[in-house]
From Swiss-Prot:
Disulfide linkage: none
Matching NCBIfam families: dhbA_paeA, PRK08220.1
Residues at which NAD(+) binds: 12-36
Keyword Oxidoreductase: yes
Species of origin: Bacillus subtilis (strain 168)
Class of enzymatic activity (EC top level): oxidoreductase
Protein name stated in the entry: 2,3-dihydro-2,3-dihydroxybenzoate dehydrogenase
Subcellular location: Cytoplasm
Reactions this protein catalyses: (2S,3S)-2,3-dihydroxy-2,3-dihydrobenzoate + NAD(+) = 2,3-dihydroxybenzoate + NADH + H(+)
Binding locations of substrate: 144
GO biological process: cellular response to iron ion; siderophore biosynthetic process
Source organism superkingdom: Bacteria
Length: 261
């Protein structure tokens, strides 16, 4: 995809050290965006940024934990000062703590929400203040199709992603008068380390693709998992000029797993 209006834009990306976040960083960088890569893991983050620089891309590493609002405010100010005005924010950082509701600990519940929901709030609030002053910007939150479909052992994850989805829509409504667009990309099962950690072997992926009446899952009509690049391409579209009149939209990228509902 040759995206309109991405070259030279500064993109703040959380969770950029691996998986979907890394794919988003690489995809936007390939279109000429300048990447402010944010992640709590400094070693992995530096590897991604070094790789991008070796390819001739513009990228800088900003290690930070999205759960820490003061740290995110500080990083946002640094990016504005050292790289320039932030044009794009992509909230990707996320965690998955599976478990039946009565087996979930307080820590597991709170840890899930602190990253998947509060982390989105912290980064969005911090960055959007600068965007409001300029009356320009685009924010995309990577949610999950689990936010709209009940799943066993996924209560914490699904609920936290549902909160992030609705928060982003509310943010989009409040920021519309400032010409700031806010959208969501909701992946289904995707080939990431986080996804593979749920399965004992490759049969896990096959079962997800097939579906199961016992677990109330419909399967994936396209008969394959998403690749991180599939999600990144959807993000690219929503932050580009091609999506200039789209806001508060939830784009589901799940191979039809939620049957378009």
């Amino acid at each position: 995809m040759n995206a309109k209006g991405i070259e030279g834009k500064i993109a703040f990306i959380t969770g950029a050290a691996q998986g979907i976040g890394e794919a988003v960083a690489r995809t936007l960088a390939s279109q000429g965006a300048h990447i402010a890569a944010v992640d709590y893991n400094p070693e992995k983050l530096e590897k991604v940024v070094s790789s991008l620089k070796a390819e001739g891309r513009h990228a800088e590493a900003f290690p930070a934990d999205v759960r820490d609002s003061a740290a995110i405010d500080e990083i946002t100010a640094r990016i504005e000062r050292e790289m320039g005005p932030i044009d794009i924010l992509v909230n990707v950082a996320g965690v998955l703590r599976p478990g039946l509701i009565h087996s979930l600990s307080d820590e597991e519940w709170e840890a899930t929400f602190s990253v998947n929901s509060t982390g989105v709030f912290n980064a969005s609030r911090s960055v959007s203040k600068y965007m409001m002053d300029r009356r320009s910007g685009s924010i995309v939150t990577v949610g999950s199709n689990a936010a709209g479909v009940p799943r066993t052992s996924m209560a914490a994850y699904a609920s936290s992603k549902a909160a992030a989805v609705m928060f982003t829509k509310c943010l989009g409504l409040e920021l519309a008068e400032y010409n700031i667009r806010c959208n969501i990309v909701s992946p289904g099962s995707t080939e990431t380390d986080m996804q593979w950690s749920l399965w004992a072997d490759e049969n896990g992926a096959e079962q997800v693709i097939k579906g199961s009446l016992e677990t109330f899952k419909t399967g994936i009509p396209l008969k394959k998992l998403a690749k991180p690049s599939d999600i990144a391409d959807a993000v690219l579209f929503l932050v580009s000029g091609q999506a200039g009149h789209i806001t508060m939209h939830n784009l589901c990228v799940d191979g039809g797993a939620t049957l378009g509902v």
